[in-house]
């Protein structure tokens, strides 16, 4: 914030009520305001009162009926990400944003007896920017059992002898 007036000026960046994104029904048990969170984050970025935002969505803890639940959840997520980048471009912010997408845990590689997937310590993060020079790249790998291989933190290549596993804390520290 440049001054106290920056906060009062923020109201100029908040969308009109009729333009605020509504809640969306994603599954029988999940209503999402993710697009509204994105919209308000972009308003805060535009208003100069915010440089980072931590957004969330729910419903991914699928201990039963995993595939059918994840299909609608991921469809909503990708639609929301597209909404975010389109809105960021319109606001003139896209070239200054780095988006991290991740979870606090992954899902087991195999189904349980309820066709769900339980908690698993191996997951993934997605790092996105508008036009990165480093895009279309995967860092890290797992074996057929979905166990992480160690990587060299300098080269980002697999290194079984002296590498390390990548943890969410590595992403948070880097950004």
What are the roles of these predicted feature ranges?
Residues 1-175:
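Ligand-binding pockets and gating/stacking loops
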